[in-house]
Amino acid sequence: MNIFRGEERNKMTNNDKVPELTNGEFDEFVKKGVVLIDFFAEWCMPCLMMASVIDEVSEKIGRKVKFGKVNVDDNQEIARKFNVSSIPNILIFKNGKIVENFIGAVSQEELEERLGEYI
């Protein structure tokens, strides 16, 4: 059972600027433009570190890239669809197609560089 909801969850993930997506919202969200999706779990320490990095990058380049996150515990269907078995797992989409996938925490500079290839 997940005891964290809404504002409490966002505080815990330190990532309240990036919307958390559900199964029903996902496909429409990644359909157009460059989109970064962060697959995470609340109990994952590297995910918490990555959440801060994603927050910073989203503030910096949020007009050029859409950012979203998916809790793998709450949205197992999406995680299975994209074969997410390790977290944090970052997928970058361009117009609905995956253009990059990487696992693990990266620096803000590296994330900006990876996104820069697609914007």
What annotation goes with each model-predicted range?
Residues 25, 74-78, 110:
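Short acidic active-site motifs
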Residues 32-36, 51-70:
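Conserved helix-turn-beta segment immediately C-terminal to the redox Cys motif
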Residues 76, 82-91:
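Structural micro-motif
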